[in-house]
Amino acid sequence: NRPTYVPPPPRPPHPRL
């Protein structure tokens, strides 16, 4: 019984300033 790895959600693209 191994824990399921949950990857972090993808981050939104950084807006160009």
UniProtKB/Swiss-Prot annotation:
Q: Which GO terms describe its cellular component?
A: extracellular space
Family per similarity comment: Belongs to the apidaecin family.
Location comes to: Secreted
For the biological process aspect of GO, one term held by this record is: defense response to Gram-negative bacterium
Q: Which UniProt keywords are present, listed alphabetically?
A: Antibiotic, Antimicrobial, Immunity, Innate immunity, Secreted
Coarsely, its chief localization is secreted
Q: Which domain of life is it from?
A: Eukaryota
- The yes or no answer to whether the keyword Lyase is present is no
Taxonomic lineage of the native organism: Eukaryota, Metazoa, Ecdysozoa, Arthropoda, Hexapoda
- Briefly, what is this protein's role? Antimicrobial peptide active against many Gram-negative enterobacterial and plant-associated bacterial species. Not active against other bacterial species like H.pylori, P.mirabilis, B.pertussis or N.gonorrhoeae.
Q: What induces it?
A: By bacterial infection.
Protein name (Swiss-Prot/TrEMBL):
Apidaecin P
